[in-house]
Amino acid sequence: DNSGTDQMEKAYWKEAGVAPKGTWFVSAGLGMGEVLTMAGEMRAYTLSDRATFGAYRAKTGLEILVQGDAKMFNPYGIIAVSPKKYPDINHGGAMKLIDWITSKEGQDLIASFRVNGEQLFFPGTGK
């Protein structure tokens, strides 16, 4: 599907020198939730983003086997578009949102967000 997770999976296969083909490999072509459900039913392995896995963990019986690889770091960012290029936008409001998201209060809220007790997002502004 060319998502970030799909691209990461392809990079891992390439780095390992393994062609993901054959009867042992299933290319589902589904959304992450559906893939997790399928992996749970098949008792198979899959690569997943943490947020979707957290939401599906109890439904599938799957457990995390590997985590923490720096290559899996998937940062989110926030930017305001140019008010010169898009004069009808609420640039002031966008800047207030950016200031709040990157503030200690915003970063603390991001860090406190949990699904089933597990932290999904890790602040990275350094403020």
For every predicted segment, state its role.
Residues 1-127:
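Exported/periplasmic ABC-transporter solute-binding proteins
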